[in-house]
């Protein structure tokens, strides 16, 4: 049955145009959604409706005004949709939601020891750390990598590695909550003068616990050996127990200092951190700066000599602290380690006598020079060539005072055609660095002298090796020094399948013995391994570098 047609058109009866096609409108976006983003489906519908062409006008052309109004409405809606595409930025959290997302922070994955580089762009400018996964990202603006990470993964809490401020992304507001103070302290530890002065007091052998419940002692923590950087670890362990240098690095503000000083200061403060999340630290950040500054002379992938590295490190640290190349004592490094040495040189000439015999004659004049030193090199006697009755090599022993006689001013050392004598001058520095020379190179191989150096950890009298000066030090009075740190070399056999094929029969391993002044106990630090050791066993290893501290006047040695 066919549909009956209408007798009259609706427009003729009502006198109005046909109702125009209404588009979906959004009222007050901020009131309805409270700063949240519209669903993706609704935004897609709005775009689709906005792109539809308007209905054609009727034959009388009575819908032109409606068409213009609809075009204006479409333009307004398109502008509104563009504004609603990005999440809204906020200057402050909503009332009652100031701790939003803080429960997502995972402290067990946070590690601020590595170099601050964006994991996407590798940039070191304006770097933020995600407190949920621990990764580094650059910036926090709408087009930054941290912003995209917050949208894609749903990690919302970030900390600025330079200012230590915490932000929530993508909203962008700063979070001020006392529960975040422990994270800020681990990222950049800061100490008061009273806390630093109490580190070495007797009876202050403090204990601390990491997040996992592991007990550790601040100042005596393991250091990560990334590959072959144990030579660096032992040097930093020794320097971190030199009180004047340590206190200077922990208390001064190095925000405008060169990167070498800034990163060393952060590493030393982390070594002495009593509220650390982990019971060890990683020197990666400082090693990267050292590798860059030394033109890859010292890296984390190749073994180096600790004395060679310490010499380079102290000289560059002296310059970075504003020290002068000509003026002595112009930095903390020189005030702690630098001393004066008198060198007497006498030339030796070879002549033939009447019987055509070669005779050596000493020059009548003796030239005396005063030089400044940072290290005192001690020469070991040559190792014996013969074996004992069991056909084993004899490992000789020599006391420390015997090899120190090089600096008594009487024993001569011959170098080519010159005879030299050495004598220390007053005043001696607060700390002495002894380099026990064990390695020598010839045209073919590097030789190692395994001689054991015996010593007492306390009561080393340096007065016999110093030229008397009554105006500085009383005649006949001892000058006591006590051992602070002892770097020991250990030769370890390599793997037969790898290193033996390459011709390496043994490899070098370094460890550091440091004194805990609070409990008067000795601690051995070898990479991540930290354990106590009796003081009677200190000299059994192959000592290579020693740090001795001058005892203050009136302080009695007891142990």
Task: Describe the role of every protein-language-model region.
Residues 2-559:
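UBL (ubiquitin/ubiquitin-like) substrate-recognition surfaces
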């Amino acid at each position: 049955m066919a549909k009956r047609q209408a007798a009259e058109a609706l427009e003729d009866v009502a006198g109005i145009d046909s109702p125009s096609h209404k588009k979906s409108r959004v009222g007050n976006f901020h009131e309805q959604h409270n700063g949240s983003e519209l669903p993706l489906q609704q935004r897609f519908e709005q775009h689709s409706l906005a792109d539809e062409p308007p209905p054609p006008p009727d034959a009388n052309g009575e819908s032109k005004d409606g068409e213009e109004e609809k075009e204006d409405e479409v333009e307004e809606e398109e502008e509104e949709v563009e504004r609603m595409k990005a999440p809204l930025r906020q200057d402050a959290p909503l009332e009652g939601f100031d701790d939003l997302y803080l429960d997502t922070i995972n402290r067990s994955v946070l590690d601020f020891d590595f170099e601050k580089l964006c994991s996407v762009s590798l940039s070191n400018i304006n770097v933020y750390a995600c407190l949920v996964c621990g990764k580094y990202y650059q910036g926090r603006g709408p087009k930054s990598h941290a912003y995209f990470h917050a949208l894609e993964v749903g990690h919302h809490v970030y900390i600025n590695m330079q200012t230590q401020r915490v932000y929530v992304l993508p909203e962008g507001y700063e979070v001020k909550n006392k529960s975040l103070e422990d994270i800020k302290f681990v990222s950049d530890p800061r100490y008061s003068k009273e806390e630093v002065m109490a580190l070495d007091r007797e009876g202050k052998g403090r204990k601390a616990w990491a997040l996992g419940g592991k007990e550790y002692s601040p100042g005596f923590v393991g250091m990560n050996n990334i590959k072959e950087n144990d030579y660096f670890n032992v040097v930093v362990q020794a320097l971190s127990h030199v009180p004047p240098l340590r206190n200077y690095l922990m208390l001064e503000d190095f925000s405008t200092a060169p990167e070498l000083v800034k990163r060393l200061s952060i590493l030393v403060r982390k070594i002495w951190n009593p509220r650390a999340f982990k019971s060890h630290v990683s020197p990666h950040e400082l090693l990267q700066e050292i590798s860059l500054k030394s033109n890859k002379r010292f890296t984390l992938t190749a073994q180096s000599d600790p004395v060679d590295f310490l010499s380079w490190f102290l000289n560059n640290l002296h310059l970075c602290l504003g020290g002068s190349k000509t003026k002595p004592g112009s930095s903390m490094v020189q005030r702690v380690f630098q001393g004066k040495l008198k060198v007497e040189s006498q030339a030796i000439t070879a002549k033939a006598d009447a019987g055509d015999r070669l005779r050596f004659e000493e020059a009548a004049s003796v030239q005396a020079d005063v030089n400044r030193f940072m290290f005192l090199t001690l020469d070991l006697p040559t190792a014996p060539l013969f074996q004992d009755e069991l056909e084993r090599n004899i490992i000789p022993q020599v006391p420390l005072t015997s090899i120190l006689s090089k600096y008594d001013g009487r024993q001569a050392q011959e170098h080519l055609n010159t005879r030299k004598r050495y004598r220390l001058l007053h005043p001696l520095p607060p700390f002495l660095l002894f380099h026990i020379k064990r390695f020598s190179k010839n045209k073919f191989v590097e030789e190692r002298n395994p001689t054991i150096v015996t010593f007492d950890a306390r009561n080393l009298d340096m007065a016999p090796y110093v030229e008397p000066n009554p105006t500085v030090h009383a005649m006949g009075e001892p000058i006591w020094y006590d051992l602070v740190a002892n770097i020991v070399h250990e030769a370890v056999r390599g793997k037969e399948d790898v290193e033996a094929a390459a011709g390496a029969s043994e490899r070098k391993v370094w460890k550091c013995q440091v004194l805990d002044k609070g409990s008067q106990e000795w601690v051995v630090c070898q990479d991540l391994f930290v354990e106590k050791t009796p003081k009677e066993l200190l000299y059994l290893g192959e000592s290579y570098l020693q740090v001795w501290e001058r005892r203050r006047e009136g302080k009695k040695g007891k142990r």
